Amino acid sequence: MGMISEFRTFAVRGNVIDLAVGVIIGAAFGKIVDSVVNDLIMPLVGRVIGKLDFSSMFIVLADPPPGTPTTLDALKKAGVPVFAYGNFLTIVVNFLILAFIIFLMVRAFNRMRAAEPEAAPAAPPEEVVLLREIRDSLKTR
């Protein structure tokens, strides 16, 4: 029974709950970034280079068997080696956007933390003040 109570104490500790909330929000945010990349950015890039669907961009590295369709999935199922760079490009763009957004959030957080006023230094103890006064009066003699 001791292990269960230890686990409950661990699980309800603030840091674990904060981490769980962060993971859930991060997963939802990842879906938003995926949508921004797949639905907004990649179609614009595809319009510029002439292809709308990056996932279908690949290079066949060997001759496919006769009668094999030339789609990426069909070639993979047939065991034909393909260099499928389209999906990789989408994931790289996705990563760069996510990394930039996280950078902006951390930067804003650091600026807010730096803007907080620093605590005033603590006043010296009364003994130190008295000793300084004695020192100063001895210097003037």
Curated annotation (Swiss-Prot):
Chief subcellular location equals membrane
Q: Which residues form a coiled coil?
A: none
UniProt entry tagged with the keyword Cell membrane: yes
Q: Where is the signal peptide?
A: none
Which InterPro entries does the record cross-reference, listed alphabetically? Mechanosensitive_channel_CS, MS_channel, MSC/AndL, MscL_channel
Q: Which residues cross the membrane?
A: 16-36, 40-60, 86-106
Q: Name one GO cellular component term.
A: plasma membrane
Superkingdom, taxonomy of origin: Bacteria
Picking any one GO molecular function of the record gives: mechanosensitive monoatomic ion channel activity
The UniProt entry, under Gene3D superfamilies, shows: Large-conductance mechanosensitive channel, MscL, domain 1 (1.10.1200.120)
Q: Which UniProt keywords apply?
A: Cell inner membrane, Cell membrane, Ion channel, Ion transport, Membrane, Transmembrane, Transmembrane helix, Transport
* Compartments reported by the entry: Cell inner membrane
Q: How does it sit in the membrane?
A: Multi-pass membrane protein
UniProt KW Transport keyword: yes
State the family named in the UniProt similarity comment for this chain. Belongs to the MscL family.
Q: What does this protein do?
A: Channel that opens in response to stretch forces in the membrane lipid bilayer. May participate in the regulation of osmotic pressure changes within the cell.
| Subunit annotation | Homopentamer.
Which HAMAP family does the entry link to? MscL
- The protein depicted here goes by the name Large-conductance mechanosensitive channel
What organism does this protein naturally occur in? Cupriavidus necator (strain ATCC 17699 / DSM 428 / KCTC 22496 / NCIMB 10442 / H16 / Stanier 337)
Q: What high-level taxonomic lineage is stated for the organism?
A: Bacteria, Pseudomonadati, Pseudomonadota, Betaproteobacteria, Burkholderiales
